[in-house]
Design a protein with these regions (language model features):
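PLP-dependent amino-acid enzyme catalytic core
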Residues: 1-331
Length: 331
């Protein structure tokens, strides 16, 4: 037997530090997601700005929507709108909000029905069912408008039903103003210059904009919508493959006046950028994350943004999209 070589301590250094606490509930683990630099992508793409990713898939159920899933139910309970064991929750969603509501509903004692477009990924539908949620699929051609219409029908007919209504609920942007924006501010030591986020409900971008501009009005916040359904640019809504953004209408939770612009990113650009991030940085991100990163790279390439800190919000992990075009040809 060959002589064992003593292990070096180096491989075990640099891991995340312990937080010194035991969480009383899975709900308490939402938020506090990391900001990560992209050294290899920066070098490969000759970026001038300092581009960071805020990895929201570090939330307990793997997406940015965990923040609003918990916030909307906690807010409704505090206002006496829902009661555990009696109220039936109904929500239209392309998947991630439903998954986040499902884990919060289980933890707090509610039944959940999710209506969603039929082109939502198989992984999302199975996750919902795993946590006991009922799902109803609506035509893909109707987009989120069709899912909303069906949810409203159920809300009118079922007794003791309540819709969190992520596209209208003020707790949606409010939780991002109170948490996501403050995390970005603190983790960059107040040196953030720009933030890019996909626009689904618009709550993430709007809340971050309100929160950060309280600290410094010069901070720029940009949204991203699919080029194939660029409603905010005056185009007609249309089918697209960037799940989670581009609902086909302007939601109440979107405050366009708080934003400094909206990028159009195509499905092809979003997928290619998500794959690039995985291949170059080893960070497998979802399709809408690829869209946000594409826009972030566009900003970081500009000579005028040399040395500026740009944050792109990564809503979810690639593994939630195994059955989508993100993984086409990779088997």
């Amino acid at each position: 037997m060959s002589k064992k070589v003593p292990l070096s301590p180096a491989p075990f250094e640099g891991y995340a530090a312990p937080r010194g606490r035991v969480f009383n509930s899975f709900l308490e683990t939402v938020g506090g997601t990391p900001l990560v630099a992209l050294p290899y992508l920066t070098q490969r793409e000759h970026l001038n700005g300092r581009l960071l990713l805020k990895l929201e898939f570090f939330n307990p159920l793997g997406s940015v929507k965990d923040r609003i899933g918990v916030a909307m139910l906690r807010d409704a309970e505090a206002r006496g709108l829902i009661t555990p064991g009696r109220t039936v929750l109904i929500e239209p969603t392309s998947g991630n909000t439903g998954i986040s509501l499902a884990f919060a509903a289980v933890a707090l004692g509610y039944r959940l029905i999710v209506t969603m477009p039929e082109n939502a990924s198989t992984e999302r539908r199975k996750m919902l069912r795993l946590m006991g949620a009922d799902t109803e699929l609506t035509p893909a051609s109707r987009g989120m408008a069709g899912a909303i219409e069906r949810a409203e029908q159920l809300n009118r007919t079922l007794p003791d039903a309540w819709m969190p209504s992520q596209f209208e609920n003020d707790a949606n942007p409010a939780v991002h103003e109170a948490t996501t924006a403050q995390e970005i501010w603190e983790d960059t030591a107040g040196k953030v210059d720009m933030v890019v986020a996909g626009l689904g409900t618009g709550g993430t971008a709007s809340g971050i904009a309100h929160g950060l501009k309280k600290h410094r009005k010069s901070i720029k916040v940009y949204g991203v919508e699919p080029r194939e359904s660029a409603v905010l640019h005056g185009d007609e809504p249309g089918p697209h493959g960037i799940q989670g953004i581009g609902p086909g209408f302007e939601p109440d939770t979107l405050d366009l006046k708080a934003l400094d612009g909206v990028f159009e990113v195509s499905e092809q650009e979003a997928v290619a950028t998500a794959r690039l991030c995985a291949a170059v940085e080893g960070i497998p991100i979802g399709i809408s994350s690829g869209a946000a990163l594409f826009a972030g790279m566009e900003l970081a390439r500009k000579p005028s943004n040399r040395g500026k800190t740009i944050v792109a919000i990564v809503p979810s992990f690639a593994e939630r999209y195994l059955s989508t075009q993100l993984f086409d040809g990779l088997a």
